[in-house]
Amino acid sequence: RSGRGECRRQCLRRHEGQPWETQECMRRCRRRG
């Protein structure tokens, strides 16, 4: 459970093809921890 690089990797894979959604996902992940 890293949370730093894993969050960005999961967001990029979960929102592949949606840069705007990936940025929001990373922002939410950073706020959660």
Swiss-Prot record:
Pfam hit, one: Antimicrobial21
GO biological-process terms attached to the record: defense response to bacterium; defense response to fungus; killing of cells of another organism
Keywords of this entry: Antibiotic, Antimicrobial, Fungicide, Plant defense, Secreted
Subcellular location: Secreted
Cysteines paired by S-S bonds: none
Function field: Inhibitor of both bacterial and fungal growth in vitro.
The protein's name: Antimicrobial peptide MBP-1
